[in-house]
Swiss-Prot record:
This is 4,5-dihydroxyphthalate decarboxylase. It comes from the Bacteria. The keyword Ligase does not apply. Keywords: Aromatic hydrocarbons catabolism, Decarboxylase, Lyase. It catalyses: 4,5-dihydroxyphthalate + H(+) = 3,4-dihydroxybenzoate + CO2.
Amino acid sequence: MSKLQLSIAVGNYDRMRPLIDGDVQIDGVDPVFMLQDPEEIFFRAFRTADYDICELSLSSYSVKTAAGTSPYIAVPVFPSRAFRHSSVYVRADRGINSPADLKGKRIGVPEYQLTANVWVRMFLEEEYGVKASDIQWVRGGYEDPTRIEKISLKLPEGVSLVNAPEGRTISNLLADGEIDGVIGPRAPSCFDRGHPQVKYLFEDPQKAAAEWYERRKLFPIMHTLGVRKTLAEQHPWLPGALVKAFEHSKAVALTRLSDTSATKVTLPFIEDQLRNARRLMGQDFWSYGFAENAHVVDRFLARDHAEGLSSRRLQPAELFHPASLESFKI
């Protein structure tokens, strides 16, 4: 029997390289990998379902699943996870010295429903009492003024969201002082260029994130992996094969990362970072699997619905193909 030739769109991450390079195989699949930025993958996945298998924004996927309009069903593989205390940038000349100072401010976002922004709004409210309705939100492309919100939104009463002026980007508005800050998964270019009046909200984002993790035990999930529903129906073995292969690929990547005799990453002190991550979060700090991550997914789904993004309160198991909820053990 010939293997299924399937398109797989993912980011070019170390945890994907063993699969991409052919060191790890997906049982029964001849993969055609398409290495793309998340913004392109998500736009094409949710607009035209271009791929057989692809990385999915957790927020956009949850919104689509709640509405019953997702062409994909996920498996508990999480290509992207990130603490987002480093995702809040503010003007240094606006008296913003703590999260509470964001109340009443104009804050730019590339898209309101981005997964990173949901996590940020969660900890701003739970830890610092800053509600979404306390902020005036301005939506626009970071660097391209034509960027649009991928998914139509119906926000709760009291939440103010306006579009950036025509032809203006969020980075330009921040640099020119027309907004007070930015929340998003990428640094605005004015920050990267060293604008003297643009800074992190948290003076030490890594310390703030570690303290938050110690309190909440949440390593935020950004992206999951989706397979076209029709494919999963035709080939019920496929979801399990994907979990097995992507888990193996990640394990190979972590083994390589742990070999610090000649580091595989072009970054000094990586061995200390790895040791600190394991000390804080355990050996399997970047876990896949449903049981290991159900509490993280549940917290996200509760917030996504509370913000008016998902039309109903989903349960974690609803996001994932039933055959992928458990894996074999030896």
